């Protein structure tokens, strides 16, 4: 990919390390992007919308409605009007406790019960997207599972379990795991689907180059592992 425009909140200096020595055309603050996009659609051929407020401990619903729901709707509408393909990040957090399984069949989306406002905001957009009659010429939503890999240093407590575990082992020689609150799982026996970020990027690029059908897909390894196995 060439002529890449990076859009983010660049006031967080720690993020600068993520794109040092990377090839891109320029950066643009997220607060300016929608206006720029509306005025310059001819400069855009494809949109990856991966950014979001992902803090699962944040309970200010207005923040999620603003950044995750309404902002994404605006990008969708601009891509639709200007016939520009869109790939966006949904989340496995939409599945909640998994009462309805983890199948990415779209008929299950209205049934899902996320556990926090972050998951709600992602599911709310998914529900909205599948009801639209007007859409980008190509659109794909990927439900990211537990992504880990390089450049998580700016994410603080929201970095992956693998990132935190690695640093604990490096500093203390051991890793401290969460106690299980589900009687069906022993301590350390909780399951997560961990997916390496570079594998995820390969799939995102595949979505750019392929004729994948429009819709919402799971994006994980396809195999859950326990925290004990991870440790």
Where in the sequence are the language-model features?
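N-terminal Rossmann/SDR dinucleotide-binding element
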Residues: 1-46
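Conserved short acidic donor-positioning loop in nucleotide-sugar-dependent glycosyltransferases
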Residues: 9-10, 92, 222
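NAD(P)H-binding glycine-rich loop region in Rossmannoid oxidoreductase-like domains
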Residues: 30, 36-67
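Catalytic helix-loop patch of NAD(P)-dependent Rossmann-fold dehydrogenases
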Residues: 66, 70-74, 81, 85, ...
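Conserved active-site region of classical short-chain dehydrogenase/reductase
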Residues: 69-73, 198-201, 205
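Glycine/proline-rich active-site loop of Rossmann-fold NAD(P)-dependent oxidoreductases
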Residues: 123, 135, 147-163, 171, ...
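Hydrophobic "lid"/C-terminal helical patch
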Residues: 129, 204-208, 231
């Amino acid at each position: 990919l060439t002529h890449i425009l990076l859009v983010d909140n660049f006031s967080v200096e720690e993020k600068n390390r993520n794109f040092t020595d990377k090839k891109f055309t320029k950066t643009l603050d997220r607060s300016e992007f929608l206006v720029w996009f509306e005025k310059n659609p001819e400069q855009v051929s494809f949109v990856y919308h991966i950014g979001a407020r992902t803090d699962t401990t944040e309970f200010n619903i207005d923040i999620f409605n603003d950044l995750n729901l309404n902002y994404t709707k605006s990008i969708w509408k601009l891509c639709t009007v200007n016939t520009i393909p869109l790939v966006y990040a949904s989340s496995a957090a939409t599945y909640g406790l998994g009462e309805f399984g983890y199948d990415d069949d779209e008929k299950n989306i209205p049934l899902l019960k996320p556990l926090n406002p972050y998951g709600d905001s992602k599911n709310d957009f998914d529900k909205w997207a599948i009801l639209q009659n007007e859409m980008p010429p190509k659109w794909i939503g990927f439900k990211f599972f537990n992504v880990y890999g390089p450049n998580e240093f700016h994410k603080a407590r929201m970095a992956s379990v693998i990132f935190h575990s690695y640093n604990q082992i490096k500093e203390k020689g051991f890793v401290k795991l969460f106690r299980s609150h589900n009687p069906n799982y022993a301590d350390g026996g909780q399951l997560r689907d961990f997916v390496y970020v570079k594998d995820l990027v390969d799939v995102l690029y595949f979505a750019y180059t392929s004729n994948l059908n429009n819709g919402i897909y799971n994006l994980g390894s396809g195999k859950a592992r326990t925290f004990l196995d991870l440790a």
